[in-house]
């Protein structure tokens, strides 16, 4: 063993060389396992007790051999060809591959061992440099190694089976964290397929669009993630983890949604989770298939983490150690694992052997391991004494049980006891020798038992069944029996004398082991003279606890005047032995101090406690023993020859009990009885020597048959091996390693934690065989680190616990001084310290690697709390000792270095995923380079968001370092960004979306806003933004100059083609500046001012050009009714309104108020001018019409001529008359008045047509209805005013027919059209309109009067 030193190393090496060549049964490794033992705690680790002291007896190999063994003991792979093994068994074959064994300075591998650890080929060189081994020899050697490995596993199983059969150091707890089923690769594939089916709509699960999107996001981000696949391969994900990740994702999504009245967000979450469960579980077919698959697994999740019974524990460790069923059965029978008395006796014998080893100082000095400090040897002896005393105390707490009864719960040390029990318990911590193991206990003296300590309480069942030979009474008489035990009487049922049978059981309790059972047979007597029933017979029986339980016939004693010749009764007596009665029977005995006369007596072996036994002799009907002795210090053995003098008086088969100052001789009449007595007393004394029956013995006990069967299979040496001859530290290490391998392969997401049953057995093994606590934990750490190196996921809390225990032990800061040496300092072996230093370095490297790859070791923050635990463990590993905390700067420096490396790892993986390096050649276009960078940017942003969402809480104490990590990450990104921007053309603006994406993300992160990368990004894009705005300004200005020169003023949306193009560009530029969301306030204000100025200038130019064009078009207007308002003018008005709507953005803020700019005032003035101009041109047409009508005034010569002048129709009619067409003439004369009327209204009709066309054009083309309504209102008012003024000028004269007809038509149509255009009736029916209407009505009346007068005259 590493660190075991001796002053006789040469002799030790010589002896080891010979021992390595002996068969396994003959190898007696001189080791005594001992250690400081503490009560079992609730820790899920194999043990949380303070350090277990290691074996007193170590392998005496040389220093070099110990170094070699140390190397192999620290790695799962041990040298298969090594012969100088520290274990009594040959070395185990390689169980796992270790790629890089970490060697300390004192640990070196010679050439032979290096060759062995590097793997084997088909040809192996021999040790003497001879020819290579043949394939047959290799197979033979391999078979031998496997056989030796199997024997070693069998030997370990023997010790494990003893621990399972009789645990006394703790209980199996069921309050450990319940582990979930882990998701394996096939299960992950099935889950992915189920979610794909849901997204394809192939399931019957109803879902809305929001839930479908959530499932789609979950599938793309989580289920299809390569990181999740790796962790599933590492056995670190359960379905619970899958559900928790989904819950976290949807919680954030649902909480961000607006509240819906009547539907709480918790209800939505629960509904979504229920649907998620339905998807992940699949349909009934999938569930049944999974259930069948799991039922075929013997270690299913339903029972793996439950509290296991003994048979289940046996089965588990049979699988772990590769033990076959028949081998287990042989071990079970040979060790009598179902006999708690035998198991307790075996434990007492183990303790006795250890105590004997402690009595030899020279031997102890030679076998003491090498410590880091020489003075620890004395402390080591004290630790061993304390450990044994602790084990003895633990054994004392186990209640006394009978054979076949399961060992119950440990007795509570604080339970109520009698004064005798308390004094007995407190003084019986050392029972196997007269002297105390602890010097402080030597003053207690011998323990004296009283008769009350050995009192017994037996339960009896007496069943009277039937009577034969009853002939003295009539058949119809009633008979019954009375049972009497120590004065307690019970009667049977009544029966007829013809059928005297009963099935009545009497239950009695007695304190004497030899009770007297009296049974009397009575018949009922119905007589006035006699009041007592008649006794027909009686029997008195003295049963023993060993009597047969089968019914027996007894001959009853008859009364003197009985007429029956023979009366027999059938009785069954069953006596339940109390737990403290281990054996009883009749023996001949003689002793020096007790039982001084050779006489046959009834003896009972009574167990008072686990270490106190007494042999008592009892008489009939007596509850107290006549004499008794305490078996403490006696040695039981067979007597090969009978004592002639004593055998002449009685007894055939002798055995003795010898003690210093006393000797007892016993004899039995039956040889089997003697064997049973010897075995019972042998278990009670706890002696190391096992009595061997004399050769002339003809009895073949059952145990001998089991031993013969074990010998037949070559297992007798393993079963009979003394545990003290084994190095249990290394055996435990192997068991722990194999158990961990088995646990990792279970379908449970254990993360390295043992199941309750496995932890319980390992705890019991380490306690019973006193495995050093530090060695246990340091080997567990080594095994866990090996698993972590293999890519499996291990809970850092488990590593943290074991590491903290080892650190406290190695640094000498123990917190339990009562269990250790003075001031809590315990012994530390050189091997423990070297292994701890090695583990500490390995653990530091592993933790730094995990923190560097935290996204891949703990994806999506799973397992829960693992990353936070890793950071805490790293801080513990960096501590120099357990008292002085590590400086925060040192911890931060390590974490900073890890996060710096993490930035490189994360960005490199993103680049590999996006294949960015492969797309940086000259064959890739600049636009494609920007697209690639946008895709990489999306990956980077998603990555940092995931870091904050899933890992931010773990880094809460190092949030600034996580921010630095992000800055470094972006600095790596900026290299590729610069490369992509350098190849962009001078006039390309494709990179602005990239800037907007980055800037928006950085602004949303308080830790990155205004950081190094953000400032660099701003400085990099600021010149591009300025140049882009300048170019856009120049481009828009040129578009204004060139566009309006060629503008055709056709309607386009809100304006013309040129204005729409210009304003689209201006709006796009404005949106671009807003979307930039520039982070620097100064430049942001500059951009805002720049955009206001640019907008104002551009609008001014557009409005000026439009107004100029409007003026030119209006100058072409005519006053004739043939003139129609051009649509181009309406389009120009639309352009002005479009300009006005955009001019609203150009405002000047002054406190809480906003004032319109000069541009608004200018545009408003232009619109008013344009309205006035249009009205002026339209009114000019009306004025022209009124001027034409003025020519028809009365007294106006021109008007008279116009009134007399024939119309074209009348001239045509006259030509027809001249031709002689009288019919036509008469017809024309009848229609002439109507034709004249139409001719008179021609002027009015032409104006109405002009008016109607203009109103429809204005309403359809101009977009601002309010402005159009205002124009119509003013136009209407002006028209009515003009007509009214014209009529007012002619108040003194009547209107001609032409004037009347034209004005009536104009007024009527104008009123109707403006009413249809939406002008208020109140405005239409103005006073002016009413005045016009009255005048026209008056003129109409005058016209009718004059027409009537003309008709009268004619």
Curated annotation (Swiss-Prot):
<dbReference type="InterPro" id="IPR014770">
    <property type="entry name" value="Munc13_1"/>
</dbReference>
<feature type="compositionally biased region" description="Polar residues">
    <location>
        <begin position="93"/>
        <end position="107"/>
    </location>
</feature>
<keyword id="KW-0968">Cytoplasmic vesicle</keyword>
<feature type="compositionally biased region" description="Acidic residues">
    <location>
        <begin position="7"/>
        <end position="16"/>
    </location>
</feature>
<dbReference type="Pfam" id="PF25341">
    <property type="entry name" value="C2_CAPS"/>
</dbReference>
<dbReference type="GO" id="GO:0046872">
    <property type="term" value="F:metal ion binding"/>
</dbReference>
<feature type="region of interest" description="Disordered">
    <location>
        <begin position="1"/>
        <end position="148"/>
    </location>
</feature>
<keyword id="KW-0813">Transport</keyword>
<dbReference type="InterPro" id="IPR001849">
    <property type="entry name" value="PH_domain"/>
</dbReference>
<dbReference type="GO" id="GO:0008289">
    <property type="term" value="F:lipid binding"/>
</dbReference>
<feature type="domain" description="C2">
    <location>
        <begin position="441"/>
        <end position="558"/>
    </location>
</feature>
<dbReference type="GO" id="GO:0030659">
    <property type="term" value="C:cytoplasmic vesicle membrane"/>
</dbReference>
<dbReference type="GO" id="GO:0006887">
    <property type="term" value="P:exocytosis"/>
</dbReference>
<feature type="compositionally biased region" description="Polar residues">
    <location>
        <begin position="52"/>
        <end position="64"/>
    </location>
</feature>
<keyword id="KW-0770">Synapse</keyword>
<dbReference type="Pfam" id="PF00169">
    <property type="entry name" value="PH"/>
</dbReference>
<feature type="domain" description="PH">
    <location>
        <begin position="580"/>
        <end position="686"/>
    </location>
</feature>
<keyword id="KW-0479">Metal-binding</keyword>
<dbReference type="InterPro" id="IPR011993">
    <property type="entry name" value="PH-like_dom_sf"/>
</dbReference>
<keyword id="KW-0472">Membrane</keyword>
<keyword id="KW-0653">Protein transport</keyword>
<keyword id="KW-0268">Exocytosis</keyword>
<feature type="compositionally biased region" description="Basic and acidic residues">
    <location>
        <begin position="134"/>
        <end position="148"/>
    </location>
</feature>
<dbReference type="Pfam" id="PF06292">
    <property type="entry name" value="MUN"/>
</dbReference>
<feature type="compositionally biased region" description="Acidic residues">
    <location>
        <begin position="109"/>
        <end position="118"/>
    </location>
</feature>
<dbReference type="GO" id="GO:0016079">
    <property type="term" value="P:synaptic vesicle exocytosis"/>
</dbReference>
<keyword id="KW-0106">Calcium</keyword>
<feature type="compositionally biased region" description="Low complexity">
    <location>
        <begin position="39"/>
        <end position="51"/>
    </location>
</feature>
<dbReference type="GO" id="GO:1990504">
    <property type="term" value="P:dense core granule exocytosis"/>
</dbReference>
<keyword id="KW-0446">Lipid-binding</keyword>
<feature type="domain" description="MHD1">
    <location>
        <begin position="975"/>
        <end position="1106"/>
    </location>
</feature>
<comment type="function">
    <text>Calcium-binding protein involved in exocytosis of vesicles filled with neurotransmitters and neuropeptides. Probably acts upstream of fusion in the biogenesis or maintenance of mature secretory vesicles. May specifically mediate the Ca(2+)-dependent exocytosis of large dense-core vesicles (DCVs) and other dense-core vesicles. Specifically required to activate the neuronal G-alpha pathway. Functions with G-alpha proteins from the same motor neurons to regulate locomotion. Involved in regulating entry into quiescence triggered by satiety.</text>
</comment>
<dbReference type="InterPro" id="IPR000008">
    <property type="entry name" value="C2_dom"/>
</dbReference>
<dbReference type="GO" id="GO:0098793">
    <property type="term" value="C:presynapse"/>
</dbReference>
<protein>
    <recommendedName>
        <fullName>Calcium-dependent secretion activator</fullName>
    </recommendedName>
</protein>
<dbReference type="GO" id="GO:0015031">
    <property type="term" value="P:protein transport"/>
</dbReference>
<dbReference type="InterPro" id="IPR035892">
    <property type="entry name" value="C2_domain_sf"/>
</dbReference>
<dbReference type="InterPro" id="IPR033227">
    <property type="entry name" value="CAPS"/>
</dbReference>
<dbReference type="InterPro" id="IPR010439">
    <property type="entry name" value="MUN_dom"/>
</dbReference>
């Amino acid at each position: 063993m590493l660190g075991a030193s001796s002053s006789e190393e040469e002799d030790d090496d010589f002896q080891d060389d010979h021992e390595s060549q002996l068969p396994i049964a003959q190898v007696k490794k001189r080791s005594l396992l001992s250690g400081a033992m503490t009560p079992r705690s609730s820790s899920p680790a194999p043990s949380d007790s303070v350090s277990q002291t290691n074996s007193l007896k170590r392998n005496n190999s040389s220093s070099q051999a110990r170094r070699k063994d140390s190397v192999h003991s620290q790695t799962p792979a041990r040298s298969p060809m090594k012969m100088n093994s520290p274990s009594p068994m040959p070395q185990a074959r390689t169980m796992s591959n270790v790629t890089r064994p970490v060697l300390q300075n004192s640990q070196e591998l010679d050439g032979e061992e290096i060759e062995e650890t590097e793997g084997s080929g088909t040809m192996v060189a021999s040790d003497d440099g001879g020819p290579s081994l043949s394939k047959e020899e290799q197979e033979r050697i391999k078979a031998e190694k496997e056989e030796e490995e199997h024997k070693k596993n069998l030997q370990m199983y023997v010790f494990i089976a003893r621990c399972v059969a009789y645990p006394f150091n703790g209980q199996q707890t069921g309050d450990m964290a319940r582990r979930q089923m882990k998701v394996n690769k096939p299960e992950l594939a099935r889950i992915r397929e189920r979610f794909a089916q849901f997204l394809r709509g192939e399931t019957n699960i109803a879902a809305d669009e929001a839930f479908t999107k959530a499932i789609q996001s979950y599938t793309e981000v989580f289920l299809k993630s390569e990181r999740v696949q790796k962790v599933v391969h590492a056995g670190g994900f359960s379905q619970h983890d899958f559900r928790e990740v989904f819950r976290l994702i949807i919680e954030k999504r649902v909480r961000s949604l607006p509240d819906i009245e009547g539907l709480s967000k918790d209800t939505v979450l629960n509904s979504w989770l229920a649907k998620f469960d339905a998807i992940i579980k699949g349909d009934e077919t999938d569930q049944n298939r999974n259930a069948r698959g799991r039922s075929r697994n013997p270690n299913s999740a339903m029972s793996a983490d439950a509290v296991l019974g003994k048979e289940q524990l046996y089965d588990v460790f049979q699988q772990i150690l590769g033990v076959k069923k028949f081998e287990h059965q042989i071990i079970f029978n040979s060790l009598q694992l179902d006999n708690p008395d035998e198991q307790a006796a075996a434990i007492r014998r183990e303790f006795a052997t250890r105590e004997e080893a402690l009595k030899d100082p020279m031997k102890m000095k030679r076998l003491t391991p090498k410590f880091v400090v020489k003075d620890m040897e004395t402390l080591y002896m004290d630790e061993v004494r304390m450990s044994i005393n602790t084990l003895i105390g633990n054994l004392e707490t186990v209640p006394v049980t009978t054979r076949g009864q399961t060992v119950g719960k440990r007795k509570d040390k604080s339970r109520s006891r009698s004064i005798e029990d308390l004094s007995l318990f407190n003084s019986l911590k050392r029972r196997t020798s007269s002297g105390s193991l602890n010097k402080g206990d030597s003053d207690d003296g011998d323990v004296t038992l009283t008769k009350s300590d050995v009192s017994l309480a037996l339960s009896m069942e007496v069943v009277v069944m039937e009577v034969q030979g009853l002939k003295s009474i009539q058949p119809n008489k009633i008979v019954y029996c009375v049972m009497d035990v120590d004065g307690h009487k019970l009667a049977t049922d009544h029966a007829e004398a013809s059928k005297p049978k009963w099935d009545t059981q009497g239950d009695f309790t007695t304190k004497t082991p030899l009770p007297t059972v009296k049974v009397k047979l009575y018949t009922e007597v119905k007589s006035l003279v006699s009041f007592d029933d008649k006794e027909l017979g009686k029997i008195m029986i003295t049963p023993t606890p060993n009597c047969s339980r089968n019914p027996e016939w007894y001959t009853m004693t008859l009364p003197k005047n009985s007429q029956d010749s023979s009366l027999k009764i059938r009785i069954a007596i069953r006596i339940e032995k109390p737990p403290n009665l281990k054996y009883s029977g009749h023996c001949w005995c003689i002793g020096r101090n007790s039982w001084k006369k050779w006489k046959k007596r009834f003896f009972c072996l009574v167990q008072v406690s686990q270490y106190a036994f007494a042999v008592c002799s009892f008489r009939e009907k007596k509850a107290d023993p006549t004499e008794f002795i305490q078996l403490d210090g006696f040695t039981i053995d067979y007597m090969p020859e009978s004592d002639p003098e004593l055998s002449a008086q009685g007894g055939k088969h002798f055995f003795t009990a010898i003690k210093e100052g006393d000797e007892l001789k016993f004899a039995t009449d039956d040889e089997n009885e003697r064997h049973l007595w010897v075995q019972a007393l042998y278990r009670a004394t706890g002696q190391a020597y096992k009595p061997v029956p004399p050769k002339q013995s003809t009895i073949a006990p059952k145990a001998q048959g089991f031993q013969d069967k074990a010998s037949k299979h070559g297992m007798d040496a393993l079963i009979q091996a003394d545990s003290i001859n084994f190095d249990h530290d290394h055996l435990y290490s192997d068991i722990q390693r194999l158990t961990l391998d088995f646990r990792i392969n279970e379908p449970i997401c254990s993360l390295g934690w043992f199941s309750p049953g496995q932890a319980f057995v390992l705890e019991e093994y380490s306690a019973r065989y006193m495995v050093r606590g530090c060695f246990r934990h340091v080997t567990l750490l080594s095994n866990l680190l090996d698993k972590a190196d293999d890519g499996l996921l291990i809970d850092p809390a488990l590593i943290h616990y074991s590491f903290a225990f080892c650190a406290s032990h190695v640094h000498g800061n123990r917190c339990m001084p009562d269990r250790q040496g003075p001031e809590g300092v315990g012994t530390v072996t050189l091997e423990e310290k070297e292994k701890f230093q090695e583990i500490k370095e390995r653990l530091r490297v592993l933790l730094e690697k995990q923190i560097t790859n935290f996204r891949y070791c703990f994806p999506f923050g799973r397992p829960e709390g693992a990353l936070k635990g890793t950071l805490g463990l790293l801080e513990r590993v960096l501590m120099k000792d357990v008292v002085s905390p590590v400086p925060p700067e040192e911890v931060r420096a390590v974490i900073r270095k890890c996060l710096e490396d993490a930035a490189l790892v994360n960005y490199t993986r993103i680049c590999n995923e996006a294949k960015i390096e492969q797309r940086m050649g000259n064959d890739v276009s600049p636009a494609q380079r920007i697209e690639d960078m946008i895709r990489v940017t999306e990956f980077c942003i998603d990555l940092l968001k995931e870091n904050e969402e899933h890992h931010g809480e773990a880094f809460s104490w190092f949030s600034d370092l996580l921010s630095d990590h992000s800055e470094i990450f972006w600095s790596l990104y900026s290299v590729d960004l610069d490369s992509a921007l350098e190849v962009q053309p001078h006039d390309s603006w494709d990179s602005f979306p990239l800037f907007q994406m980055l800037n928006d993300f950085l602004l949303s992160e308080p830790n990155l806003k205004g950081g190094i990368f953000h400032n660099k990004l701003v400085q990099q894009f600021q010149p591009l933004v300025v140049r882009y705005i300048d170019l856009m300004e120049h481009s828009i200005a040129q578009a204004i100059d060139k566009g309006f020169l060629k503008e055709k003023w056709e309607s386009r949306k809100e304006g013309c083609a040129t204005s729409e193009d210009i304003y689209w560009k201006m709006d796009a530029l404005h949106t671009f500046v807003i979307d930039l969301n520039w982070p620097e306030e100064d430049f942001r204000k500059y951009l805002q001012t720049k955009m206001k100025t640019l907008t104002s200038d551009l609008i001014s130019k557009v409005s000026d050009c439009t107004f100029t064009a409007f003026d030119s078009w209006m100058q072409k207007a005519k006053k004739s009714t043939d003139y129609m308002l051009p649509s181009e003018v309406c389009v120009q008005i639309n352009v002005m309104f479009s300009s006005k709507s955009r001019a609203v953005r150009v405002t000047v803020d002054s406190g809480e108020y906003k004032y319109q700019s000069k541009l608004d005032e200018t545009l408003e003035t232009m619109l008013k001018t344009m309205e006035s101009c249009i009205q002026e041109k339209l009114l000019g047409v009306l004025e022209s019409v009124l001027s034409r009508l003025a020519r028809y005034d009365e007294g106006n010569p021109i008007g008279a001529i116009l009134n007399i002048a024939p119309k074209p129709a009348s001239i045509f009619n006259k030509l027809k008359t001249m031709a002689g067409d009288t019919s036509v003439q008469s017809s024309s004369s009848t229609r002439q008045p109507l034709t004249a009327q139409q001719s008179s209204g021609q002027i009015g009709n032409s104006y109405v047509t002009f008016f109607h066309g203009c109103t429809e054009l204005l309403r359809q083309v101009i977009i601002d209805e309010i402005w159009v309504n205002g124009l119509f209102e003013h136009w209407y008012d002006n028209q009515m005013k003009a007509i009214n003024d014209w009529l007012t000028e002619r108040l003194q004269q009547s209107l001609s027919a032409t004037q009347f007809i034209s004005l009536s038509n104009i007024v009527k149509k104008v009123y109707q059209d403006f009413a249809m255009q939406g002008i208020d009736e109140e405005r239409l029916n103005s006073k002016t309109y009413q005045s016009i209407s009255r005048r026209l009505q008056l003129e109409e009346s005058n016209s009718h009067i004059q027409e009537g007068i003309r008709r009268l005259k004619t």
